[in-house]
Amino acid sequence: KFVAGADTGKKVAVIGGGPAGMAGAYQLRRKGHAVTVFDDNKHLGGMMYYGIPGYRIPRDKLESENQRIVDMGVELRMETRIGRDVSVADLESEYDAILWAVGCQSGRGLFVEGWEETSNCVSGVAFLKAFNEGRMKVTADKVVCVGGGDTSIDVVSVARRLGHIEHTNPTDRPELVVRDGYVAHDAAVT
């Protein structure tokens, strides 16, 4: 069990309930500061919850670790967007400090002109977030994934679990492509 430090009388707003925000909340509570975490999402965890499939990071483990921090006396304001539901001016007047821990949630698009206007083309991050929120609507019979990093591999794994990948070439596996001691998954190979 985590233990909060002696009360300092200071209040800190933490914007973002992902790994950085929760680590910040933990450290601030250890120092004795009152902490309120604001997050736009329904669940804590940020990209660990919404960007990585649950079969890779079990939700019960993620939630129990976050709960250990909350149990230190962290107040939560979930489904609250700064700028829409609460103004920055309100935060500045109510709190002694603000920790911005909003993470990297946007993903990258294709380097192809006009891809944004394509109705069936989404970023890997948007695809995984829709899957993790339970609002996945795949209307195509096939999914094409451009890329070979961690996010791309998660997208392909989810698509395969959803039944949209029927055939893969046995040699198209990153662990089979090794150059200079690195697999293709670890480093770009040119």
Label the model's feature ranges.
Residues K11-F38, R77-S87, E92, S106-R108, ...:
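Rossmann-like dinucleotide/flavin-binding elements
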Residues M47-D96, F111:
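N-terminal Rossmann-like dinucleotide/flavin-binding domain of flavoprotein oxidoreductases
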Residues D39, I69, L99, C121, ...:
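Conserved hydrophobic/aromatic pocket- or pore-lining residues that grip, position, or stack substrates
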Residues M72, E116-E117, H185:
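Short, structured coil segments at secondary-structure junctions
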Residues A101-E117, C121-V122:
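Flavin (primarily FAD) binding-site architecture
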Residues K1-T36, D40-H43, M48-Y55, N66, ...:
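Fe-S ferredoxin-like electron-transfer domains
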